[in-house]
């Protein structure tokens, strides 16, 4: 982790990561997760997906000025969060449950199942550290 991130981390702590739950519906046909503008804690600037193989590591960066929502819509994702004072490990494996990560939190993500898919919804395009 670099010095600039450590400075940002003085203001942003792991404890400020928030759990986010989307509406979820299940019946005999399958599952449906719904994300609408009013149900998201941030305004959407862009959406991107990442699919990776088992034990692939991604992210390994922090956003300097941008909050982001992270969901694992298929498979399982282990997210290690680091604010330069404390580390926390979170497991995402339900498409309706995600996390809102504030700027300055270093993220390392490991895909625990083949073809796991992550959706990221950043508040705005941001600079990575």
Give the predicted meaning of each segment.
Residues 1-99, 114-129:
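Non-catalytic, conserved peripheral segments adjacent to functional cores
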Residues 101-104:
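Short beta-strand-centered segments at strand-helix junctions
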Residues 106-113:
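Beta-rich strand-turn-strand
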């Amino acid at each position: 982790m670099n010095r600039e991130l450590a400075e940002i981390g003085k203001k942003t702590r792991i404890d400020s990561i928030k759990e986010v739950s989307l509406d979820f519906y299940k019946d005999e046909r399958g599952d449906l997760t719904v994300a609408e503008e009013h149900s998201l804690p941030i305004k959407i600037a862009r959406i991107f997906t990442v699919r990776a193989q088992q034990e692939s590591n991604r992210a390994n960066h922090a956003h300097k000025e941008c909050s982001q929502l992270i969901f694992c819509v298929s498979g399982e994702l282990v997210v290690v969060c680091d604010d330069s004072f404390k580390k926390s490990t979170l497991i995402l494996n339900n498409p309706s449950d995600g996390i809102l990560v504030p700027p300055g939190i270093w993220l390392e993500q490991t895909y625990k199942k083949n073809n796991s898919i992550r959706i990221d919804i950043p508040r705005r395009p941001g600079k990575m550290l």
